[in-house]
Amino acid sequence: MSIRIVPKDQLGKQSEKGTTAGNIPPLLFANLKSLYTRRTERLQQLALDNPLADYLDFAAKITQAQQKALHDHPLVLDMQAELAQSAASGKPPLDLSVFPRTDHWRKLLSALIAELRHDAPDHIVAVLDNLDKASVHELELYADALLNREFAQIGSEKAPFIWAALSLYWAQMASQIPGKARAEYGEHRQFCPVCGSIPVSSVVHIGTQNGLRYLHCNLCESEWHVVRIKCSNCEQTRDLNYWSLDTELAAVKAESCGDCGTYLKILYQEKDPMVEAVADDLASLILDAKMEGEGFARSSINPFLFPGE
């Protein structure tokens, strides 16, 4: 099954009923009113007893700055034309490979830089100063490199700040998409149906979506449904295994696939209702080291941890 977003005016009564498969919502948009606040709180909580405490606190400062930038720099767009075009082409409406960026993302970056400068250590201030002095052309090249996963083209010290601005920009746009999501037969469920990016991790929900697994986009923050008995990367079902650092009851596990040799974190709200897709993934890097030691490659990217040059 693949997921496609359809404009509301193209949904008749019959197709409206068909926007979910077995009453399963195929797509969940982020609640921006609480997303960054919740992520900040979770990062701060996880930092209390973690060998990566300093970096988790650093990430929390970035998410706090994202929350402020979201409030200070709202974005209002008419997404009808983009949605109609994407529905006709079968492409994600905010396809990161072709969607024309405006200067709004650079305004967000400037706001993040200004906010983070206040109490940042000297080595971070130096990075922020370099970004602040960069030309529009340079910043757009950095953005292109990150979105195209050409990480050698941008220093890993700059990447989290550029991505934080891009992600907030894409999340703001995604929150204004007026269509409905519909599950259809097809492939490529490893990519976000909203923007075409990849997941940071997956979350097994409680509440209304109890027991359902959703992949969380590392760019636009949307979540899309993928069944739990299928590899989120290659869609095979033959050789899936689950790994944890603690016990079988651990809230954070890694789902590995013997077919494609990759793994993705899977977070269980039933075990810990406070798990958060980005924060808990970042705080469990020891599990990543274990998976790499077992010969598996990570199929996702955390927005605070990009591959080095």
From Swiss-Prot:
Q: Where in the cell? A: Cytoplasm
Note the InterPro entries from the entry. Answer: FdhE-like_sf, FdhE_C, FdhE_central, FdhE_N, Formate_DH_accessory
Query: What's a GO biological-process term for it?
Result: protein maturation
The GO terms describing molecular function are: ferric iron binding
Where this protein primarily resides, as one coarse class? Answer: cytoplasm
Coiled-coil parts of chain: none
Q: Which UniProt keywords apply?
A: Cytoplasm
Source domain of life: Bacteria
**Role according to the record:** Necessary for formate dehydrogenase activity.
Which family does the record assign? Belongs to the FdhE family.
User: Could you tell me what this protein is called?
Assistant: Protein FdhE homolog
The taxonomy runs:
Bacteria, Pseudomonadati, Pseudomonadota, Gammaproteobacteria, Enterobacterales
Q: Which gene encodes it?
A: fdhE
